[in-house]
């Protein structure tokens, strides 16, 4: 009788391990859609927190099938019109008599203007650590690489699996926030 009871307990434990995490499946489906897309477009509002000061700006973004992101700064008016491209190998800015002067974050690992590119790169290839419900949204936590000094990104997606908000954390501290609007995968 003890053996049967032990066997039943083991079966219950093993049955619990076989359950599927639907939120992880949704996160992986979003990744697959991004990897298979020819392009993606979205608007971002970015807030960079330096502790003693905060910078905010808005960008229109378009990515290609390789994850390269072209952008145009739309707000504030003082830097509107600056364009650029960010890729794995680096980036370029184009402007007339205006310069983006944002100090680097995360021990010189991250420029705030690269936040949209990092959002897509992380969704496409980062180390997915968790996914679960957060109110009406799903929260996905992803590290940008498998190293100890990885940036962590918490991304909230709506019911249609479109990113709507993200936080970039460095050593557990929120350094950048991103609001995402009009996210479209083509």
Predicted stretch roles:
Residues 35, 44-47, 93-146:
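Flexible, processing/modification-adjacent segments and terminal tails
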Residues 36-39, 61-69, 85-90, 134-135, ...:
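Short, solvent-exposed coil/turn segments at beta-strand boundaries
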Residues 16-63, 186:
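N-terminal leader/targeting segments and the immediate start of mature chains
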Residues 1-15:
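Sec-dependent bacterial lipoprotein signal peptides
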Residues 131-186:
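Gly/Pro-enriched, hydrophobic low-complexity segments
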Residues 50-54, 76-80, 147, 173-175:
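Solvent-exposed loop/turn segments connecting transmembrane beta-strands
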Residues 56-60, 81-83, 152-154, 177-179:
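Well-ordered beta-strand positions in beta-sheet-rich domains
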């Amino acid at each position: 009788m003890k053996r049967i009871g032990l066997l039943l307990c083991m079966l219950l434990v093993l049955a619990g391990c076989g359950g599927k995490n639907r939120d992880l499946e949704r996160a992986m489906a979003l990744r697959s859609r991004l990897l298979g897309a020819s392009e993606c477009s979205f608007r971002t509002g970015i807030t960079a927190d330096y502790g003693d000061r905060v910078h905010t700006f808005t960008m229109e973004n378009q990515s290609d099938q390789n994850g390269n992101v072209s952008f145009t700064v739309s707000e504030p008016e003082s830097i509107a019109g600056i364009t650029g491209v960010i890729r794995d190998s680096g980036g370029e800015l184009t402007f007339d008599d205006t310069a983006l002067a944002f100090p680097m974050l995360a021990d010189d690992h991250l420029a705030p203007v690269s936040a949209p590119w990092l959002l897509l790169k992380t969704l496409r290839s980062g180390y997915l650590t968790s996914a679960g419900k957060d109110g009406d949204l799903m929260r996905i936590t992803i590290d940008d690489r498998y190293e100890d000094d990885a940036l962590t990104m918490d991304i909230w997606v709506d019911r249609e699996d479109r990113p709507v908000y993200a936080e970039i954390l460095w050593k557990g501290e929120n350094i950048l926030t991103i609001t995402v609007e009009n996210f479209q995968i083509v």
